[in-house]
Amino acid sequence: MAELKMRSSRVLRKLRAGEVVCMAKLNTADARVAEIAAQAGFDCLWACLEHVPNSIEVIERQIMVGKAYDVDTMVRVSRGGYSDYIRPLEMDAAGIMVPHIMSLKDAKWVVRTTRFHPIGRRPVDGGNADGAYCGIEFNEYLRQANEQRFIGIQIEDPEPLDELEEIVALEGIDMIFFGPGDFSQSIGAPGQWDHPLIDQTRRRVAELCRKHGKCAATPGSPDNLQSLIDMGYTALNMCADVVGLFQYFNGIAADIRKVIPDFGKETAAGGMYGKLR
């Protein structure tokens, strides 16, 4: 039998080659949507267990779809015990992202629970998809997991800023994701994207990641993609499935109203969100 190895991470492969990674966020539970995003060419599917009411089985199917196209899946985990962090990795997610890191101590705990010896003390199983169901030799499994799986953390609060450089420099952390949405409300300026502290922190994350050889990540769009790359960001979340579906259906509805002005009137009047138009 051929020697079994852990699937290499497309994200890490591109980052190590100095290339930019583009991600697509999945809110829906349908694996077919994940497949459409993978077919489109995105490097990484961003699945979520923090905000989205998806089961662990849904996430597992999304991971499997990505693997069929050599597309990574990054799972944003819920804040909880170590099992919440390692289960997506054991399902063969290429990476996880931990939200709302508040301190250097907080970040060190993430490393301790998600990295194997000699970096951390992640609990070992090996009998899951990432270990080829016990098909990878024990020490090789530990080595390959440390080498081919990425750990991301989110900076989206002011609390960790005093220790930001120490957090970025921490061994075992690959990606620092700046989240401007939560950051804006945490500093009392919700939605004020041009607020000086938001701009300053966005730039500081990029500068520190460049200094310490880490990946700076943040949400992006085709309109600001080049400016974020120029700033130093090397991983960008470019879209979300629910946004695309919302824009598509409402765009079609607007075209229909050019011919049938009352189209959707009943829905707008009686829907749970009230009159949308």
Label each PLM-derived region with a short phrase.
Residues 1-27, 135-147, 203-211, 268, ...:
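N-terminal amphipathic alpha-helix/helix-capping segment at the start of soluble metabolic enzymes
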Residues 22-26, 45-47, 73-77, 96-98, ...:
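Hydrophobic faces of well-ordered beta-strands that scaffold small-molecule active sites
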Residues 10, 55-90, 112-120, 143-147, ...:
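Alpha-helix-loop-beta-strand connector modules within alpha/beta enzyme cores
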Residues 2, 9, 241-244, 248-277:
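Extended, intrinsically disordered, low-complexity segments
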Residues 95-109, 176-185, 234-252:
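Glycine-rich phosphate-binding active-site loops on the catalytic face of alpha/beta enzymes
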Residues 83, 95-171, 265-277:
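Conserved anion-binding
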